[in-house]
From Swiss-Prot:
Pfam families: OST3_OST6. PANTHER family: OLIGOSACCHARYLTRANSFERASE COMPLEX SUBUNIT OSTC (PTHR13160:SF9). This is Oligosaccharyltransferase complex subunit OSTC. The gene is OSTC. It comes from Homo sapiens. Component of STT3A-containing oligosaccharyl transferase (OST-A) complex. STT3A-containing complex assembly occurs through the formation of 3 subcomplexes. Subcomplex 1 contains RPN1 and TMEM258, subcomplex 2 contains the STT3A-specific subunits STT3A, DC2/OSTC, and KCP2 as well as the core subunit OST4, and subcomplex 3 contains RPN2, DAD1, and OST48. The OST-A complex can form stable complexes with the Sec61 complex or with both the Sec61 and TRAP complexes. Interacts with PSEN1 and NCSTN; indicative for an association with the gamma-secretase complex.
Length: 149
């Protein structure tokens, strides 16, 4: 395998560059990187790429038995289609579940008082369980009869 890596460098020659980091460029803090990761996770799981390409409406509508138009947030019976609000709601749940796991992880720090540890555990479990069960409710709204045992 080493010979395969060496073959291109038999022909190519690496330049002798002395590159320096610009003085205005600083390493971002851990919380800045974390915030960027969470925001990008929220946008990607919300289907921002799908929303840009397909341009779906923000909410849909259906006609009830009296002939009135009623707004609906979920595009039922379509697994590969979504309204914008549906994607944002699902993305919020996924992000809340992920933050719940991070809160549960942070509760294991050795220097946290007992009351704060209990509160972090409670909030973490609530976030994870709420996001899980609400995602199941969303799946029942999206595909009626799918998770019915």
């Amino acid at each position: 395998m080493e010979t395969l890596y060496r073959v291109p460098f038999l022909v190519l020659e690496c330049p002798n560059l002395k590159l320096k980091k610009p003085p205005w460029l600083h390493m971002p803090s851990a919380m800045t990187v974390y915030a960027l990761v969470v925001v990008s996770y929220f946008l990607i799981t919300g289907g921002i790429i799908y929303d840009v390409i397909v341009e779906p409406p923000s909410v849909g509508s259906m006609t009830d038995e009296h002939g009135h138009q009623r707004p609906v947030a979920f595009l039922a019976y379509r697994v590969n289609g979504q309204y914008i609000m549906e994607g944002l709601a699902s993305s919020f749940l996924f992000t809340m579940g992920g933050l719940g796991f991070i809160i549960l992880d942070r509760s294991n720090a050795p220097n946290i008082p007992k009351l704060n540890r209990f509160l972090l555990l409670f909030i973490g479990f609530v976030c994870v369980l709420l996001s899980f069960f609400m995602a199941r409710v969303f799946m029942r709204m999206k595909l009626p009869g799918y998770l019915m045992g």
